[in-house]
Amino acid sequence: MGELRPGSGVHYPGSVGELRSWFGTDEDCLDYLDWLRWPEGFVCPRCGHLGGWAVADGGYKCAGCGARTSVTAGTLFDRRRTPLTVWFEACWSFASGKDGMSALSLQRSLEIGSYATAWAMLHRLRSVLVRPGRDRLTGTVEVEETYIGGEEPGLRGGRAKGKKVLVGVAVEVTEPRGFGRARMQILTDASAGTLHPFITAHVEPGARVITDGWTGYQGLDKLGYTHEPRSQRAARARGEDPGGLLPGVHRIASLAKRWLLGTHQGSVQEAHLQSYLDEFVFRFNRRRSRSRGMVFYRLLELAVAHEPVRYRQLVANPQPKRVPPRPPPGGGHPPSLDRPRAARPWRTS
């Protein structure tokens, strides 16, 4: 959005009441997505030409190549069946909940007839939470690995056994005990061939990187980092708790596991774990935001910047494995949430 500084009540709704007043019809929602996607005017997704003509179905015809496109084509909302008014309610619920929400909670709150629909909506939202080209971590950064799904003392990296998933954790640390942004990513093992790419993908060269003494971290200085390894063995020899060497990543890992257990009862399949980690990081990095409306705004910005994810990409089976036995009454897809129409303040700012 360039130099735009979004404001509550102008560029995004400041309350759920304002949300429902602004987005009473799918046409209102489409206009908002149009404004978010092309704030300086229509840009053809096919040829990149600036400018076109609005067509009767609410889309555009490119003035350059003549291609027709809809506002939602190539976005999270492409080929949707659920009304956009319901999607916007789901986005608000997703953004406004401090700890997120389960598919069952979304199904009940919006009276979505199909649990599978609510489940897929949440997973599609999770699929857009990583901004393309996002900035890497800077300053002082702690890096460590952890296991999601259980731990076995004494096992590490490729030597680990059991149904656990190895996850890389990186977090900016500030004095005296503060945290900045975080990153989490599933790792295949804890070798240098895996850890080095994880760090270069998420940490800006020149940063001070603090790790334990694991051999997989050796050589970071050659990649442009100031590497500070901290030996667990030396800490034990000094009578110190080795867990205190990297308090930042241990805190983040603990919060993530607690969040998975509390919000999703720990029932996260490995195939979807990265999406849940992306959601946790999205929420953690916005923990100081005072406006849920701003988080809603950022979420929709991401939604129009990402390619759509199809249902068949989300599941290996025709439906999620855990389907509640008593869905709310109604059809497979909710009706549009009809509301009084309001002005479109984002167009008048």
Which residue ranges define each predicted feature?
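Residue-level recognition of single "structural anchor" positions
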Residues: M1-S349
